[in-house]
C-alpha cells in the first residue's frame, strides 16, 4: 500500500471511531433517562400500591347513610388519612432514590450520582428534621 492509501484508511477509521463515540454517548444518555424514568415509575407504583392497600383496609362497610350526607369523614377514613400523613412517603421516596444512586437535591435532582459518590446537598436535605 502506498502512503496516501494508508493515510486515507487511518483518516476513515478516525471518522468511524468519532461516529461510534457519538453514538455511544447518545446511547449512554438514553440509558440514563430510561433508568431515571424506570426508577420514577417503580416509586410511583410502590406509592400507589401503599395507597391502594390503605384504601382497601379503610373501606367502611356499606351503610344507608354516606359521608356526604353527614358532612363528616368516617372514623376509618380519618385514621387512614392520618396514617398516610405519618408515613412520610415523600421523604421515603427521596431516600430510596438517593440509595439507588440519584441526586435528590434541588441542584442536580434526578441526575445519576457519579460512582455512587455522596452529595453534600442531598445529604443535608435528607438529614433535615
UniProtKB/Swiss-Prot annotation:
It comes from the Bacteria. Zn(2+) binds at residues 103, 105, 119, 122. Binds 1 zinc ion per subunit. The keyword Heme does not apply. Its cofactor is Zn(2+). GO terms for cellular component: nucleoid. Keywords: Cytoplasm, DNA replication, DNA replication inhibitor, Metal-binding, Zinc. Residues 52-71 are annotated as: Disordered. GO terms for biological process: DNA replication. NCBIfam families: PRK13169.1-4 (NF009643), PRK13169.1-5 (NF009644). Homotetramer. Interacts with both DnaA and DnaN, acting as a bridge between these two proteins. This is Replication initiation control protein YabA. The lineage of its organism: Bacteria, Bacillati, Bacillota, Bacilli, Bacillales.
Amino acid at each position: 500500500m502506498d502512503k496516501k492509501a494508508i493515510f486515507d484508511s487511518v483518516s476513515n477509521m478516525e471518522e468511524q471511531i468519532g461516529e461510534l463515540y457519538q453514538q455511544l454517548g447518545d446511547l449512554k444518555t438514553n440509558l440514563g433517562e430510561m433508568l431515571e424514568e424506570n426508577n420514577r415509575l417503580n416509586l410511583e407504583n410502590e406509592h400507589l400500591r401503599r395507597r391502594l392497600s390503605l384504601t382497601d383496609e379503610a373501606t367502611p362497610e356499606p351503610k344507608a347513610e354516606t359521608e356526604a350526607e353527614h358532612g363528616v369523614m368516617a372514623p376509618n377514613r380519618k385514621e387512614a388519612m392520618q396514617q398516610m400523613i405519618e408515613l412520610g412517603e415523600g421523604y421515603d421516596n427521596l431516600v430510596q432514590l438517593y440509595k439507588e444512586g440519584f441526586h435528590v437535591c434541588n441542584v442536580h435532582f434526578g441526575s445519576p450520582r457519579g460512582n455512587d459518590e455522596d452529595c453534600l446537598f442531598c445529604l443535608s436535605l435528607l438529614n433535615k428534621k
